[in-house]
Amino acid sequence: MEHTYQYAWVIPLLPLPVIMLMGFGLFLIPTATKNLRRIWAFPSILLLSIAMVFSLHLSIQQINGSSIYQYLWSWTINNDFSLEFGYLVDPLTSIMLILITTVGILVLIYSDDYMSHDEGYLRFFVYISFFNTSMLGLVTSSNLIQIYFFWELVGMCSYLLIGFWFTRPIAASACQKAFVTNRVGDFGLLLGILGFFWITGSLEFRDLFKIANNWIPNNGINSLLTTLCAFLLFLGAVAKSAQFPLHVWLPDAMEGPTPISALIHAATMVAAGIFLLARLLPLFISLPLLMSFISLVGTITLFLGATLALAQRDIKRSLAYSTMSQLGYMMLALGIGSYQAALFHLITHAYSKALLFLGSGSVIHSMEPLVGYSPDKSQNMVLMGGLRKYVPITRTTFLCGTLSLCGIPPLACFWSKDEILSNSWLYSPFFGIIASFTAGLTAFYMFRIYLLTFDGYLRVHFQNYSSTKEGSLYSISLWGKSISKGVNRDFVLSTMKSGVSFFSQNIPKIPANTRNKIGSFSTPFGAKKTFVYPHETGNTMLFPLLILLLFTLFIGSIGIPFDNGVKDNRILELTILSKWLTPSINLFQENSNSSINSYEFLTNAISSVSLAIFGLFIAYIFYGSAYSFFQNLNFQNSLVKKNPKKSFLDEVKKKIYSWSYNRGYIDFFYTRVFILGIRRLAELTHFFDKGVIDGIINGVGLAGFCIGEEIKYVGGGRISSYLFFFLCYVSLFLFFIP
């Protein structure tokens, strides 16, 4: 067994040979390399598959033995300092290795078809393979300095992939925004690492955990200083995992290709922050004040992400805010000490969200022939609808991913989210209320995405009403792009055939000839008309969807209790995940060591599922085809007429819609306070530098020049005059000296 662990260092290095070969090929024989570019996908997938098999073997050994293996190499600088580096294999590492390799392989397979017509096909595969290498290196790191090194590589790869289509100004601005926002967290992480190195003289995890176990309880170290350094480490996780208030980069990261959006949101970049917090949880758990702050940040993030997803029109941005909210659940779980629940939700969410993002890519792929290749149209749910008839496989997989994220049993996210909700109620009723209410919101906005995309009728004709300036409203306004004033914010979607908005006083009127076009898109070619419909994607893109569907259906079983024998007349029940993980730092570990209370489990499950079903029902009323039924019966109109507070309710609806659609005005606040403030400070500094500093220097030079000119004319070039003035100055000097 130990012989196998000795070669675990190979796993992060396996994708590197293909990267190097593609680089050499593009440098030495660029024409041949580009002509044979589709061949390079096979070795990329093959080597990552080998890494997956190796990771699976390590995971099986971890489940059976739950042992921790660490290998270190020491590089001695001098007698007082040596740098150690190596790799660590424990249950957390094995979980992340399986997650990264499985999702990475499916994304690579999907990308082969999705990016096949892109000129940057080879560049994309180089970036994404290096992304996988960086993340694999991060999760196997044995100390903080190695984590920071791979942490920066992950950030660099995300910058390159978000700005992959860098010729588009919005994409270029989005990658800059992600880079600068993460710089804030990375700087905090670096300061935290340096702070703990100053305290302990080491960067190894075991020394940090020694602080938690021995020094802090015995007052052997300043707890305030330790809390400050730990907070700086947490700041790095806040930026990487898009937690409030450093979440603003995540929606704009959707400017990259859809496969990389799936990888970022499922298994790599945003998972890095959760991984760092889970890795250092033995340290954080000894600092109760910081743990409370972590849980508070997670609670704010999960609720904020859900509210911001309520009115988004871009399908990928809606899923991005969903990711932000689910990461908030994980952060909340870690903050209350529920280590197992957080990692369980990380696993289930990764496969469900990868399924949803790849499904959205399939939808975008099918819409592009109809509306064009601009993301403002191909990703706009205003123009979708009725796709269930045209892309049935994508629709089925997307529905399963949606229901999983809503928390509907027996799909994956039900088991993990229910565990987080239960633990939240045990820790604090306040956190429990917010988390449960957000679970209902999650069901609402996720089913809204599904209904607007697949239910009702195709709304391609609305592209005439969708101004291109609208894109600036949810694009990179933080980086100097003006916000359009001409957007109709009262335009709220429904999937019904005979109308466009609900609960709106001003319903846009659609010309009759336009209304007749619903269901198809007519493209004129001379005297003929070719009707273009959405179509299902190829098998290469459907295969990853079906595999992820299986994960979504069955991965939750690792958290289902099973019989583990009888002790003290009680049936002991464990889960595969509890055997996999080390439960010693889980504050709720007693649940895994005692008999399961079936009544309590059913009560919690019924409560969470009821909230989810209620959210689904409300979403179906607002956005589903059933709305046309209510409208035809005049049920809704009569209800509104009888309501004396109609204007107040309309105003509340508009405020909520405006809050959500404009990202809670957080980007606007950052623009006014930070971006414009820094620019004004830069202008003031520039003025001070040019007007004051340069003025003093130039003034001194000019004064010297003028004085010299005056003295030149006084002397006249005669030596006798120079001697006369010299003697005068000497006389005055001697006269004033006592």
Curated annotation (Swiss-Prot):
Enzyme category, top tier: translocase
Complex formation: NDH is composed of at least 16 different subunits, 5 of which are encoded in the nucleus.
Keyword Transmembrane helix in annotation: yes
Role, per record: NDH shuttles electrons from NAD(P)H:plastoquinone, via FMN and iron-sulfur (Fe-S) centers, to quinones in the photosynthetic chain and possibly in a chloroplast respiratory chain. The immediate electron acceptor for the enzyme in this species is believed to be plastoquinone. Couples the redox reaction to proton translocation, and thus conserves the redox energy in a proton gradient.
Catalytic activity of the protein: a plastoquinone + NADH + (n+1) H(+)(in) = a plastoquinol + NAD(+) + n H(+)(out); a plastoquinone + NADPH + (n+1) H(+)(in) = a plastoquinol + NADP(+) + n H(+)(out)
Biological process annotations from GO: ATP synthesis coupled electron transport; electron transport coupled proton transport
Location in or out of the cell: Plastid, Chloroplast thylakoid membrane
Similarity annotation: Belongs to the complex I subunit 5 family.
Name of the protein described by the UniProt record: NAD(P)H-quinone oxidoreductase subunit 5, chloroplastic
This enzyme's EC code(s): 7.1.1.-
Keyword entries, A-Z: Chloroplast, Membrane, NAD, NADP, Plastid, Plastoquinone, Quinone, Thylakoid, Translocase, Transmembrane, Transmembrane helix, Transport
Membrane-spanning residues: 9-29, 39-59, 89-109, 125-145, 147-167, 185-205, 219-239, 258-278, 280-300, 327-347, 354-374, 396-416, 425-445, 542-562, 610-630, 691-711, 717-737
UniProt lineage: Eukaryota, Viridiplantae, Streptophyta, Embryophyta, Tracheophyta
InterPro entries given in the database record: NADH_UbQ_OxRdtase_chlpt_su5_C, NADHpl_OxRdtase_5_subgr, ND/Mrp_TM, NU5C-like, Proton_antipo_N
Entry superkingdom: Eukaryota
Any GO molecular function: NADH dehydrogenase (ubiquinone) activity
